[in-house]
């Protein structure tokens, strides 16, 4: 049930009847304050200006045509021409009933699309670090939301699995007689990488061998391909452990590494030349883009093939976008890549559009994000100033949550405590990130994220258990409760019901904008409204069974909404804390 969409259409029709153009925007929004109703239509200002009349005068005319019978109990004009809409308690009650009767809580299924989501993208032969956290969990929240809404989602884990480093690694493994790379731990491999790089920089004979190995690998030599596959296997096996710990939905089947696009690159360069988009410049192949200027104000040159014949990330990204449209049949492509890559992506996509590889009707969206910072406001590092490994961060989260949970539950069995600590610890790390607007940097703070107050995972998980505790005490007959009507008489009942029915609107925003913090804010607000409702509207000691059952149903929908909302974020709920 999308009340905002329903009201928008009703107000738009009334505006047209009052003389507004057919493309008018009613600008129906959820009201910020309770005294302004549940929704506000703010579109009169812009339209009245076009019509040469006062906004309030237009609002009055719109009201004469606005039929919200059975939806709103009151509609009033406020200020210079805002229309405040107060939802009818009977309308709220009816739709709470419908939401409870639906597995999807009344959420409609939009027109199905094929959506490719590019996220996580770690590098082969390196362990995942905290820099991979945001892309991995924000992208996964988007995937979960889009899948819940009914879209066909293709996860694309664009791992860095190609390049000169593989010549180095294979040469060094061979030198160390470590051909059986499949038995190595990734931690070993990182050490190997450092040693290989040192030798590459200091030993010209070794560097030459490494360069030869790259050529052999790229030409398809089976021995070198097999060594390369082993390196990829070790890395992705290790990464899968991290994905599972993080409760993200990525699997090995979702890996679409850079190597996938290699066979396409010569053809793309040739095609761009044939179309007159790419030219030779100082031995390299370059596309000049009018949309991007260099310091001299001239069109910027984007290199797609180096003088030595090598390709660049831009070339791969052009091939990647083409593949996602032509082979995966994407209707929409979302890239969860940090903000530093924005210009690079815009340049690649400008070439993609000019070449006609992806039509304008298929959006390519960079859902960029800021950095994770330490308390000092600088990029998050270890005490020694090194990069924080993601596995180490999750270990610390688990340890801190274990202490927190044990303190509150000294008698809890060890296995139960471990499971709870895992849900709380991992949930805290994820929620702390997801609850921030992804476009901004944020401060990573253990104390804040593990607090039981404020917009945190422990608070949300506790809020859920609090609702469940009502049902444990109530000794409910499920059939009787299902048949009982919902009756809304108190203001707090109405406020809670209205917010519950805004779940679909929230999902729609997250799906459109890729902003999971909007879901976090909604769930936090919902938990707060339930708390006020619980305090002022007795449930178990209600004046009669009819009111008791009705309030139990509001509590039931609250629990279901909190659980489903947290699930779209990849946050586990718990039965008790």
Swiss-Prot record:
Entry EC number(s): 6.1.1.19
Main location: cytoplasm
Subcellular location: Cytoplasm
The reaction(s) this protein catalyses: tRNA(Arg) + L-arginine + ATP = L-arginyl-tRNA(Arg) + AMP + diphosphate
Molecular function, one GO term: ATP binding
UniProtKB keywords: Aminoacyl-tRNA synthetase, ATP-binding, Cytoplasm, Ligase, Nucleotide-binding, Protein biosynthesis
SUPFAM superfamilies per record: Anticodon-binding domain of a subclass of class I aminoacyl-tRNA synthetases, Arginyl-tRNA synthetase (ArgRS), N-terminal 'additional' domain, Nucleotidylyl transferase
GO biological process: arginyl-tRNA aminoacylation
PROSITE patterns to which the protein is assigned, alphabetical: AA_TRNA_LIGASE_I (PS00178)
Cellular component terms per the entry's GO annotation: cytoplasm
Superkingdom of source: Bacteria
Chain location of the short sequence motif 'HIGH' region per the record: 122-132
Family statement: Belongs to the class-I aminoacyl-tRNA synthetase family.
Assembly, per entry: Monomer.
Name assigned to this protein: Arginine--tRNA ligase
Protein's organism: Escherichia coli (strain 55989 / EAEC)
